[in-house]
Amino acid sequence: IVPGKNCTACGACVQKCPKSCISMKEDENGFLFPQVDTDECIGCGLCDRVCHLNINMRNDETKMAFACTHSSDDVLKVVYGCAYVTPTEPHHIRVARKEDLKKLRGSKYVQSEIGNSYQQVLNDLKFRKWVLFTGTPCQVAGLKAFLGKPYDTLVTADIVCHGVPSAAYFRKYIEGYEKKHGCTVRSFDFRSKENNCGTYAGICNIDNNNRTLTRKIFYFNEYYYFYFLKSELFRDSCYDCHYTNLFRPGDFTLGDFWGIDGKKLGFNSVDGCSLVLLNTDKAKKIFKELNVCSSKVELAFAVANNAQLRESSRHTDFRKTLLREYRECSAEEIQSCFKRRYCIARIKARIKYAVPRKVKKILLKYRHLTK
């Protein structure tokens, strides 16, 4: 098994082990790592051979980039993706009904547990079912390593990923939020379209005194959200990611299309615009059959406006302080330190958020014209 900091917790080794002697355990900072029961291990080496970091996943096929908005209800037969199974625990789940696809929507700025999804995918593929698997690049790479060979009926889509904090860190934050507000969190969406599109504002649905309430979550008010955007909370492997480039493991790459405001696309992007990279011939063929509003853009433009297509996220020495706070402090204490530490930055963020979106679009358009 790949040691320590390089491990991405994709879980392929856990599902491949013929003796089921590998399990995922949290370390002192809440990150998941594989742990081997040496008494049960037979030394077969499958865990090493299935690790995507030990396999060349480089995809050299010619890429195409598109700006897109969704305009179709067409779906594949089975979809795998990340969903909250509790308000603090995102897991990969299998979806076979159209009405359940909504569970996979929304941004989840926390690492999901794969569980036995790879084995479920294999079972579906054996029955010749069409499968769409979505996840972070390392999860897609983990699936492909687990399968060991390509399948005609498998379609994969990796996301433009900044990095993943631990579920334990997120769980601690939610527990602190519940204690502070005297409520029970029912759902959490970091980037809700109920707020202004393109803003870092989420939605938290809570139960409070027998009432169900909806509260906006602003990154400048919450330590977890703020530190995520500063790239200080991720697992070690995220800062040396193998997939922050154009050699993607997925057939498709999906993400927000930053920097697209001011571009003439030929369709209305007021509700947001997605970046879609077509990484394989399979993706290009499927894309032609989809009912989406799209506009082809230069690949170089997409890369220039999405940093994680060029380089891994970076952290500062401050990350050590945040991990120490996680180990030693309560959520209330971490929140209090955050507010004192970033008082001025939070005021500036509030002012920036108060500027109407229409004004921002005019300024962005002017910036493009003056370049």
Task: State the predicted function of each range.
Residues E178, C183-K371:
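Long, compositionally biased charged/polar accessory segments in the mid-to-C-terminal portions
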Residues T38-D124, A302-R324, C329-E333:
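Flanking helices and flexible, charged tails adjoining ferredoxin-like Fe-S electron-transfer domains
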Residues K5-K19, D39-N54, T136-G142, L233-L246:
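Local cysteine-cluster metal-coordination motifs and their immediate loop/turn environment
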Residues A12-P34, G202-Y223:
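Short, charged low-complexity linear segments at domain edges
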Residues D152-G176:
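Short, flexible loop segments at boundaries between secondary-structure elements
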Residues I1, N6, A12-N29, F33, ...:
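Iron-sulfur cluster-binding cysteine motifs and their immediate structural context
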Residues D73, T86-T88, F133-L143, G163:
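Gly/Ser/Thr-rich loops at beta-strand to alpha-helix junctions
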Residues I1-G4, V36-D39, F220-L229:
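Short, intrinsically disordered, charge-biased short linear motifs at domain edges
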